[in-house]
Amino acid sequence: MGDVELTVFKRENDFYKRMLAIAIPITLQNLITIGINMADTMMLGSLGEVALSASALANQFSFIFLVIHFGLAGGAGVLTGQFWGKGDKESISKTLSMMFKISAVFSFTFFILGQFFPAQIMRIYTPDPSVIAEGVKYLRILSFAFLVQGFSTIAIGILRTVGIVKLALCSTAISFFANIFLNWMFIFGNLGAPRLGAAGAAVGTLISRIIEFLIIAIYLVFIDKRIQVKIKDLFKHDKAIFTDYVKHGTPVLISDFILVIGLNMLSVIMGRMGSEMVAANSINTVLQQFCTVFLMGVANASGVIIGNTVGAKEYDKAQDYGKTFLALAVLIGCFSGLLIFSLKNVMIGFYDVAGRTKDIAYQLMNTTSIIVVFSAVGSTLTKGVLRAGGDTKFLMKADVLFLWLLAIPLGFIAGVVLNLPAGIVFFCLKIDEVIKALWCTKRLLVDKWIKNVTLA
């Protein structure tokens, strides 16, 4: 047994160098993003549960937008990662241009919804009038960010598949410092700025998104030499690439869209349990993100390496790499769980919130420290290995099936009908992570997941 365990980690030195070269910049980028989220929740938490809950629930609508773009970029990344493995730069440029046009449609749609129907959106998540009122102000401002954020998300997601990861780190780092400073100004009214409360966080986020957009646009137009995006491709339609995207990328988009709607249903359930539950989950989410930040880097690296390897038609090597990434996910997941359990008291102590909110956060963190082992495996396989291997139709089932058939109904019954303790409710809401991890592990081990989607 020990020899088997040791063998799965035995890879050529280049494997781990490639993995770390991708994972470390992404990890640092995610750390910066988590820093923004933590600063936001701490600043807004000092204003009370209403402000914190309003921003958290309004951001669920933004989360739908973001995950749709993760789906767009992830679906395209299945193609571009394998295009890069076979050395087809022109197809990568055409794919990126095609995705910008599709993104523009979603960006404008979400802008209209957020600008003109914010109250209706907030009522989906909570019946609390004070939370709705704060959320409306937040969402109206944040909706302008949709017009630029889609472009940035698509560009970063696809550029990662060809090994360009430092751009995201650079743009995120600059926007991070801008966001923290601007939030401090507009939330509390410092340096002569108006005191806007929760809406001030939206102003800071909007300006930082614009800065991020400008950095990425300047890079693509004036600096990039690797894939050489052509402006003229924006005005062309490549039928072959579009057909490939519809066949292999659409399942990713559909699964991510249905998944995010399901995750929003979980937020609706928590919203019906009160602002304390919402605020506690915001605190728990920050700690979970912090403790799994390296895992997310490894999961992204797995997608790049597997996609490039499959594109180069090295299928046996891709299968071996997949098993190594699975083993790494288990190890990192266990470490993350221990870290969450160890840091929960310290983390909760940072927040100036009510005692009941702290009690709920404590319960959620206990549950998360167990669930995170399974979510580590699930994230690495669904967003990295299996997706990059082209097994997108299987993943559409894995991402959606258990969330809608188990987690949402069980969570609703436990939280809204039976009013069970928060920790038990949270476990019910996350039960799909456990089953998905086991199902995807079985899929990986039967070696039926590799599909070269770039073959003519």
Predicted regions and their residues:
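Short runs within selected transmembrane alpha-helices of multi-pass transporters and secretion channels
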Residues: A73, L142-R160, A168-N179, A201-I216, ...
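Interfacial/gating helices of multi-pass transporter permease domains
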Residues: L44-F63, T95, P129-E134, A198-G200, ...
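N-terminal transmembrane alpha-helices
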Residues: R11-M42, S46-L47, Q60-G75, L79, ...
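Structural signal for membrane-spanning alpha-helices in multi-pass inner-membrane proteins
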Residues: G114, G157, N183, I187, ...
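Short alpha-helical transmembrane segments in multi-pass integral membrane proteins
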Residues: M1-A23, T80-A145, A193-T250, I306-I371, ...
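Helix-terminus/linker motif at the lipid-water interface of multi-pass membrane proteins
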Residues: L31, G35-S53, M122-P129, M185-L196, ...
